[in-house]
UniProtKB/Swiss-Prot annotation:
Top-level taxonomy: Eukaryota, Metazoa, Chordata, Craniata, Vertebrata
Domain of life: Eukaryota
Biased composition (Low complexity): 220-233, 380-391, 826-835, 847-858, 993-1004
Pfam families recorded: DUF4585
Protein's name in the database: Proline-rich basic protein 1
Biased composition (Polar residues): 267-276, 531-542, 861-870
Record's GO cellular component terms: nucleoplasm
Composition bias, Basic and acidic residues: 277-304, 318-328, 346-367, 759-774
Source organism (scientific name): Homo sapiens
InterPro entries cross-referenced by the UniProt entry: CEFIP, DUF4585
Gly residues bias: start-end ranges: 84-94
Compositionally biased residues, Pro residues: 548-557, 691-700, 813-825
Residue ranges of the region described as Disordered: 1-111, 139-164, 196-236, 259-460, 488-678, 690-883, 991-1015
Amino acid sequence: MLTALAPPALPGIPRQLPTAPARRQDSSGSSGSYYTAPGSPEPPDVGPDAKGPANWPWVAPGRGAGAQPRLSVSAQNSRQRHGPGSGFPRGPGSGPRPPQPQLRTLPSGEMEVIFGVGPLFGCSGADDREAQQQFTEPAFISPLPPGPASPAAVPRQSQVPDGGSRWATYLELRPRGPSPAAPAQFECVEVALEEGAAPARPRTVPKRQIELRPRPQSPPRAAGAPRPRLLLRTGSLDESLGPLQAAAGFVQTALARKLSPEAPAPSSATFGSTGRSEPETRETARSTHVVLEKAKSRPLRVRDNSAPAKAPRPWPSLRERAIRRDKPAPGTEPLGPVSSSIFLQSEEKIQEARKTRFPREAPDRTVQRARSPPFECRIPSEVPSRAVRPRSPSPPRQTPNGAVRGPRCPSPQNLSPWDRTTRRVSSPLFPEASSEWENQNPAVEETVSRRSPSPPILSQWNQCVAGERSPSLEAPSLWEIPHSAVADAVEPRSSPSPPAFFPWEAPDRPIGTWGPSPQETWDPMGPGSSIAFTQEAQNGLTQEELAPPTPSAPGTPEPTEMQSPSTREISDLAFGGSQQSPEVAAPEPPGSHPVGTLDADKCPEVLGPGEAASGRPRMAIPRPRDVRKLVKTTYAPGFPAGAQGSGLPAPPADPCGEEGGESKTQEPPALGPPAPAHYTSVFIKDFLPVVPHPYEPPEPSFDTVARDASQPNGVLRRRAENSTAKPFKRTEIRLPGALALGRRPEVTSRVRARGPGGENRDVEAQRLVPDGDGRTSPLGGARSSSQRSPVGPAGVRSPRPGSPQMQASPSPGIAPKPKTPPTAPEPAAAVQAPLPREPLALAGRTAPAQPRAASAPPTDRSPQSPSQGARRQPGAAPLGKVLVDPESGRYYFVEAPRQPRLRVLFDPESGQYVEVLLPPSSPGPPHRVYTPLALGLGLYPPAYGPIPSLSLPPSPGPQALGSPQLPWVSEAGPLDGTYYLPVSGTPNPAPPLLLCAPPSSSGPTQPGKGSLFPL
């Protein structure tokens, strides 16, 4: 630091300074340059500059003669080579120079020159001033050598070789130097404008006396300290936001509720023991069972996973997840609307995750208390704990997390997916379940990685998985996957396992019963839509318990069960996980909706072809779809949503179940639905807020999705992919549900082949029962779609919107439970209906109309119509489905199929595929559009009023207002579905109402649905 030590000037010397220069110094001229007045005592030759740098050697020499220190802005602004006759009376003759300016290098590196600052630096006279300056400055300067350390800002002076000096004024001069006592520090700055002309003539700028008020130590200290404070604040905000978001009310409430039961920190210890660094941190927070901890853990998880993706730690927990879902790169997430869904799901999943933890703890306490730490440990030492620990002793627990994992290294696999660290470990542990899990792990691992990249998935999956990643969410997700792989191994245990599943599943659900007893909980859960999902997911359990003979299905259910908790927890993740139990479970969380497809892809691939063998290869396949879906993510939310809420979730489940569900088709769908149930409630609601009711009513979509699940083997997967492109693609996937039905016979056959009809039927029946309860049957997902559609509109549909609540909360779950009895019958009807649908779907598959969602929902409804028709008839609107045209992104409300021939037509104008019902009974031009009035306004929801412009002669088979749904089914034959009136979002008949020749009944419904909702 250049500190100019001014040779102490004699006190008297300053008085020798000419007054004029002093006056000049005193002059208030701001920066105007003026030539020294002729009368100026100092002649042009006189002055420090006249003598050249030698006059001021002490000022600059420190830096080095001719060295020009960096000038502050002020100095640069006022640079001048001071002419020989600079305004400063610096000449030796003029008296001892004003106390030599101190050259000080500011921390910034700028050189500042401090002129003598007199305590009472008045403008009175140069003599007094100079004297004061010198008196003060000797002290001020001498300390300033240390002064450089002092923050006091110093005007900087740099000397150029020619002797010109640049003076910078550092306005903030801290008196904390040696002269803190100075009442006021005045800095005399000579501002010389650089002038190339006649440097000989002294152009001096009046020196301005600047009263330097010591900045309250702001420049160095204030700037330094407050800024870190800001950072700290930011961190605090992040922390607070993270906990707030994660715990936000819902989580806090859930945690608070569960913390009391969970007060015993088996999970805590277990999580602590959890050897996962990432999950461990999360789980440790989680294990603390503190709402904030849980919230933090969740935000931490989000941060851990999404921090790479986004800086804001708080946001990654919720908003970032939502954003990631919206723009999920790797198969993240669903849809922008999912953001709210994410919040709901996050809460739900957090609750579920906590419930899962709690279930683990509570169920462990209740069922497998001893297992609780193991369960928790299972998560940390999932591999050893599950593999080594004979989950058999603690099958329920073991099954939920690693029920079969114990015997099956799947626990590592489980870990591997849900614990990236463990997952990596899982790769070593891989060996046992690794065959499956290798594939699944890679996929899951990759998916998990995706999930990490895509907080949205993390939001879903991590909310569930991260939320439960420590306990069972991820583990369930993965152990769902392993469960699929382990399903066979788990099957036996599944029977024992169900209680644990139910307990933790029940806990998974915010169901009071979860705490009491696994089965008790599981029962309420079974009733609950979520429970139904769990039950259906656990329907495997249910089937395992109920249909233990059909271990294959139970095995499937068990993954489903395991997934079911995971589903609840991960809802979407579990959905994917349960669907693709092994592979998709993990991948799905990244792209839950992709999981729907992935489920279809992976589940069938992993599950269908052979949990391990098929899982591997297909995992590779599903993963592309996963990626696609992840990329398309818009569709996936639909699946999870569908699976969870109603038709939609089930279809993903079915796709997984039917595709992978040859063995576990039906059950994973059950799981799928449970998980999607949350999503559906949230996703579909948020996702399809405009048409949630139309969408939800199209429970057949659920079946369709399930069928799509079936179709995923062939068509459906494509559709899933396509559907993935758009949020409502789901619906279109549902349309392929007709194909799914076609597949469904296959899948059903496969499932039934797997479970000799009895098992399958058990699965189906139980699934359907859970479906009735939660409308979450895997097969029931599709079949139950009918049930769901009927019940769904009444109970499931409401729950479906509240599906997260249903699944998350026992009452919603219980609410569906009452419907379980009807659903139980429904299951048969639904199963039967789905079977007809399957043929219909096959027919529809043959029919071009099949390709799009419209056909699937109609197909679903057609078979469902008998049972659903009755149920749906109460609200004709529910018959319709909201379909999204992936090309145009338009939403079409499509009437439930009256079973006219469904044709999927491509509207080049809108670029949409429109499913048009061509009623076989209507010989008239298939494109006739019938006025909705034919059916009457009563059939349409207010949003779907008849479009007068669309009024056309009713078709020969106009369905009465009362029976438009069923009449269509009867009249239309298997796949003739509702007519699509792609009205381009407007009731105008002008939009190419593609082939709107619906029966008059369909016409009105179509107008209802026909009034396309371009969202």
